[in-house]
């Protein structure tokens, strides 16, 4: 599924809200290198690795990143993997609560799944991806590395077989004519639902461990730091791209859906595979991150809704929220980043190491 995960890189920076707020990143290296999450948000990972966290040579980082991308690409090009994803999505179409949507779901899947797969498999370029992450030096773009999607592709992805109302940018729910279906048919909701189901099935921890095994070049001071880096930032990127940008961009291309109902930060700094002793910090950062995108008035409701996330222990989350709600609300609306907020609450260690490894069980 890397051809979908890496869509933001191929589409250019204007296609999605990838970066952290510009004012925060404008603080410079002191802000960028506080954590891996912030380094990724500000596209300063290469700088932090070379200048702050270790003595990595730029060329080595670039090569290591490209190796990681190639491994993930190879994994996702396997026919058995694609068949598994296709069957999974077909099953999701079959179990939709509103059975009237099932035929349209299968139609959308059958028509556009192969189009998206074929295009992005042919467009994966490790060098471009690693430049976007700040791990390869920027240079003059080569003609075949244009990041903008071509007009012919857009023509293929605007659902020409469906009513004209679906072919223009507009509300995120569009209707078929009353003659075809007597109720509104939310194609964009359907698209996002299927992609979120894919998100839930991907074993991010297993992928991260596989990525960590390719580390053999980077000569950082601390032994094993490359494997740690590979494991940790792979999980972070998968969470970020699958959680927000993948639904936005794929559904935006296929259905021209608007981004009005997008919620949550571009980079959710919460891999579910963190070790048990970090669970309180993890929970706090997730809740705080979810609340950070809302107005002060909407923050309490956003904090409570965060506990409904499928991977959280709901009871522990609600207990945490009840215990910390007044102060959490004040800190979350004060413009601090999630980790700083949770340090202030005592949920996260103040001696946080940006390159602290995660512990993932081997399967």
From Swiss-Prot:
Boundaries of every Saposin B-type domain copy: 58-140, 184-261, 277-352
Glycosylation sites: 293
Subcellular location: Secreted, Extracellular space, Surface film
InterPro entries (alphabetical): SAP_A, SapB_1, SapB_2, Saposin-like, SaposinB_dom, Sphingo_Act-Surfact_Prot
A Gene Ontology biological process term: lipid metabolic process
Predominant place of localization: secreted
Gene Ontology annotations for the cellular component aspect, listed alphabetically: alveolar lamellar body; extracellular space; multivesicular body
UniProt-listed SMART domains: SAPA (SM00162), SapB (SM00741)
Disulfide bonds: 62-136, 65-130, 93-105, 188-257, 191-251, 215-226, 281-348, 284-342, 307-317
Domain Saposin A-type: 18-58
Gene3D superfamilies cross-referenced by the UniProt entry: Saposin-like (1.10.225.10)
Proregion span(s): 17-180, 260-363
Further remark: Pulmonary surfactant consists of 90% lipid and 10% protein. There are 4 surfactant-associated proteins: 2 collagenous, carbohydrate-binding glycoproteins (SP-A and SP-D) and 2 small hydrophobic proteins (SP-B and SP-C).
Protein name stated in the entry: Pulmonary surfactant-associated protein B
Species whose genome carries this gene: Canis lupus familiaris (Dog)
